[in-house]
UniProtKB/Swiss-Prot annotation:
SUPFAM superfamilies: Aquaporin-like. The lineage of its organism: Eukaryota, Viridiplantae, Streptophyta, Embryophyta, Tracheophyta. The keyword Repeat applies. It is a multi-pass membrane protein. Interacts with cucumber mosaic virus (CMV) Protein 1a. It holds the Pfam family MIP. CDD domains: MIP (cd00333). The gene is TIP1-1. It comes from Arabidopsis thaliana (Mouse-ear cress). This is Aquaporin TIP1-1. Induction: By gibberellins. Residues 45-56, 125-143, 194-218 are vacuolar. PANTHER family: AQUAPORIN TIP1-1, AQUAPORIN-8. InterPro entries: Aquaporin-like (IPR023271), Aquaporin_transptr (IPR034294), MIP (IPR000425), MIP_CS (IPR022357). A motif (NPA 1) lies at residues 85-87. GO terms for biological process: hydrogen peroxide transmembrane transport; urea transport; water transport.
């Protein structure tokens, strides 16, 4: 079962007004999400004297990221699709749902949105450190890599099922909620181990501002592999599967 056409895109696509508007929407949505997510961790650290790594800090991070992503996806959905994540964009590309050129434009916007968000946070908080993603004690690089693959697979699979699949019908209206919920749940599951990034842009901004690059590749490779697998599986086995409704009988 072939997937939809994977396309590079026309050379002028990167300068088309609709593509530029979509990229701007991705920039704004990612900025909103990172301010809420990273900002909540900084606020919790300030209020609890660096207690963001405690169980209550984990719950606070999960709630803030779930709510923040719900809003970020909602405000961008009708303009760019509300990806807010290079792994989601990559999964959409693997499934033939976005061209390579537009995907690169989205990536640039998402990364810039994250960096600008972290710079704003650092300035607005009077120079507080923006915490970068890192592995917890006793967690190996391979462990974190697998965790990021699995969690991002769940995220991108949810995006496909609720937002990309043309058969989703009314399910599409709850897509932002479902996407926010899966991210919040994954943070509760994996936050104590890898930090549960699931999003290269979310990891990139804090890494740039704090200039912390230890094991940073994990937060790119894991999500991209997981997102790509999810996009491929959903596109091949579900979107392109023809469905014939069972006959009904009146009694």
């Amino acid at each position: 079962m072939p997937i939809r056409n994977i396309a590079i895109g026309r050379p002028d696509e990167a300068t088309r007004p609709d593509a530029l508007k979509a990229a701007l929407a991705e920039f704004i949505s990612t900025l909103i999400f990172v301010v809420a997510g990273s900002g909540s961790g900084m606020a919790f650290n300030k209020l609890t004297e660096n207690g963001a790594t405690t169980p209550s800090g984990l719950v606070a991070a999960a709630v803030a990221h779930a709510f923040g992503l719900f809003v970020a996806v909602s405000v961008g959905a009708n303009i760019s699709g509300g990806h807010v994540n290079p792994a989601v964009t990559f999964g959409a590309f693997i499934g033939g749902n976005i061209t390579l050129l537009r995907g690169i434009l989205y990536w640039i916007a998402q990364l810039l949105g994250s960096v600008v968000a972290c710079l704003i946070l650092k300035f607005a908080t009077g120079g507080l450190a923006v915490p970068a993603f890192g592995l917890s004690a006793g967690v190996g690089v391979l462990n974190a890599f697998v965790f990021e693959i699995v969690m991002t697979f769940g995220l991108v699979y949810t995006v496909y099922a609720t937002a990309i699949d043309p058969k989703n019908g009314s399910l599409g209206t709850i897509a932002p909620i479902a996407i926010g919920f899966i991210v919040g749940a994954n943070i509760l599951a994996g936050g104590a181990f890898s930090g549960a990034s699931m999003n290269p842009a979310v990891a990139f901004g804090p890494a740039v501002v704090s200039w912390t690059w230890t094991n940073h590749w994990v937060y790119w490779a894991g999500p991209l592999v997981g997102g790509g697998i999810a996009g491929l599986i959903y596109e091949v086995f579900f979107i392109n599967t023809t469905h014939e409704q069972l006959p009904t009988t009146d009694y």
